[in-house]
Amino acid sequence: MNLRAAGPGWLFCPADRPERFAKAAAAADVVILDLEDGVAEAQKPAARNALRDTPLDPERTVVRINAGGTADQARDLEALAGTAYTTVMLPKAESAAQVIELAPRDVIALVETARGAVCAAEIAAADPTVGMMWGAEDLIATLGGSSSRRADGAYRDVARHVRSTILLAASAFGRLALDAVHLDILDVEGLQEEARDAAAVGFDVTVCIHPSQIPVVRKAYRPSHEKLAWARRVLAASRSERGAFAFEGQMVDSPVLTHAETMLRRAGEATSE
């Protein structure tokens, strides 16, 4: 599954609401069918049945199973065996061993605890891992805190630290980096600012909890027309240059060209000839 090419707008959808599956798939780049926190305990059997009975495109679908070591996870995996889905999201990931147990499935490790944050590099290095995500609210709860954000909406320092840790671990091992959800659905401006920052520092995805957030995220990740035009020009100029060179008043070297290639990739344009 080439999730890197899917796009930046991923959407959680409760797995016990199969009537929402098609709408979610139409709105999002990737749908995350949720068997964990989004489903009440009494509804989990129905959610597992819905996975089998209401299939989506497995190339654009991830299933969030329950945490490792739980009876619910074992039941989730049994249900998944009857589907075409090959990628799972592991919540509260805390070790490489938890990820390796899920092979041969591809795994997006969701880090939501202090132990998971400390072991992020180990988790990212595990062979089944294809992506790394972090979760702010569960993280703060496990730390004994009460709020992940300050009054102005900005993340508190510990949340920012874990966010950066996950991004670095994902990048170090060539995994997708997924930014946490923005819980305030009505705060479009806050989501836009957060998604722009995520794209600027190297996240591949901002995960959403409502279809209305998807276009905001896509717009935030897409470079402006001016930046795309610059990227095309500088890459064209680089073909006749060796090493670093001056271009439009700026010194250009390999990292600058990588930034330009990333812009075009996010816009869906090829960068090789």
From Swiss-Prot:
GO terms for molecular function: lyase activity; magnesium ion binding. Mg(2+) binds at E112, D138. It comes from the Bacteria. Binds 1 Mg(2+) ion per subunit. SUPFAM superfamilies: Phosphoenolpyruvate/pyruvate domain. Its cofactor is Mg(2+). It is an enzyme of class 4 (lyase). Keywords: Lyase, Magnesium, Metal-binding. Belongs to the HpcH/HpaI aldolase family. Citrate lyase beta subunit-like subfamily. Homotrimer. May play a role in fatty acid biosynthesis. This is Citrate lyase subunit beta-like protein. It comes from Mycobacterium tuberculosis (strain ATCC 25618 / H37Rv).
